[in-house]
Design a protein with these regions (language model features):
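Alpha/beta enzyme core
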Residues: 66-67, 71, 91-92, 104-221, ...
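C-terminal helical cap(s) of enzyme catalytic domains, especially alpha/beta-barrels
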Residues: 8, 140, 199-212, 250-275
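Short, charged beta->alpha transition segments
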Residues: 27-38, 77-89, 112
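A gly/proline- and charged-residue-enriched helix-loop-helix capping module
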Residues: 69-106
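Charged C-terminal helix
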Residues: 269-295
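An N-cap/entry alpha-helix motif that binds or orients negatively charged groups
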Residues: 1-41, 285-286, 292
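Active-site cofactor/substrate anionic-group-binding motifs, chiefly glycine-
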Residues: 36-81
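Short glycine-enriched loops at secondary-structure junctions
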Residues: 52-53, 79-85, 129-130, 173
Length: 295
């Protein structure tokens, strides 16, 4: 098949089409701190919920990922992982959210939620965009069969735990409102690294989804976020916090000890600069009118 419609490329082009208006008068040194689910973070910049880093990079990469988050006070999101790996990451010291796959064996979902509760994770999430393979049939991941989540199942998942439940893979007002009505307390706008071609860029979907919700809940964004300017664009358009994924993998590969922490701190500096230059001096003052779409 011809490689067309790559959603990562489309998302990158969309990000680059968003321009930033400066507003210097009455601005001040910005405060980018964030309170999320009762915890305070130095920045709304988070890690993405990556999986199988030891397989994709080198043995110990997942530990380096968790350590990089802990050393910078960054909220750590983790994707598919065994309980021991999750515990090892949590022991590094970062606040942590685990994203759980839509296992056809639903008991496994509940088991993972109970484990997350037992080790003190900040929240748990469900990957709703991972049930199907390339032929539209059930996806198979590491020997596990996946299946689509129903709204009734999502209600049961939300009611079974005291942890906030987040849904990852939302790109429509339909999924957003269905999830919120089921009791979800956070949404991740993401096309999951080109799960489907020609997907709407998350920042294109963000304003409409935010406007459609009657309840104010955290909205997270991932996909092609690379710089503090990218982060700012997402925040200005209504995101609560923003995840970075593949650039952190590259940073770890280049420098396993300090690459990730250095990258995160540099992106924070870029975000502070952009907030100062636009008069958005804290996260509550983010203003979508400073973003202009270059046609």
């Amino acid at each position: 098949m011809i490689n067309v419609g790559n959603s990562n490329s489309i998302t990158r082009r969309y990000l680059d089409s968003l321009l930033i208006e400066t507003r210097y008068l009455n601005s001040a040194h910005p405060d980018q701190s964030l309170i999320l689910y009762g915890k305070k973070f130095a920045s709304p910049i988070m890690t993405a919920a990556l999986s199988h880093l030891d397989r994709h990079l080198f043995p110990g990469s997942t530990d380096a990922y968790a350590s990089g988050a802990a050393s910078t006070g960054t909220l750590l999101w983790l994707g598919m992982a065994g309980d021991e790996e999750v515990e090892r990451c949590k022991a590094k010291g970062a606040e942590m959210i685990e994203i759980i796959k839509p296992y056809a064996d639903r008991d496994l979902i509940y088991k993972k939620i109970r484990h997350a509760e037992s080790i003190g994770l900040l929240a748990v999430g469900i990957d709703i965009d991972h049930p199907f393979a390339d032929d539209g049939g059930p996806d198979q991941v590491d020997g596990f069969t996946m299946a689509p989540i129903t709204s009734d199942e999502l209600k049961d998942i939300c009611s079974c735990t005291s942890l906030p439940v987040i849904v990852k893979g939302v790109l429509s007002s339909y999924d957003a409102n269905t999830a919120v009505n089921a009791g979800v307390q956070g949404l991740v706008l993401s096309h999951h690294n080109n799960r489907i071609e020609y997907a709407i860029p998350p920042l294109h979907a963000l304003p409409e989804i935010k406007a459609s919700l009657e309840k104010d809940i955290p909205l997270f964004v991932d996909g092609e976020i690379q710089t503090g300017m990218d982060v700012f664009k997402a925040l200005a358009l209504g995101a609560t916090a923003v995840s970075i994924g593949r650039p952190l993998m590259a940073a770890i590969k280049k420098d396993p000890e300090a690459g990730m922490s250095n990258y995160l701190l540099e992106v924070r500096k870029q975000l502070s600069k952009t907030m100062a230059y636009t008069g958005c001096t804290n996260l509550s003052k983010m203003d979508p009118s400073v973003i202009h779409h270059m046609k």
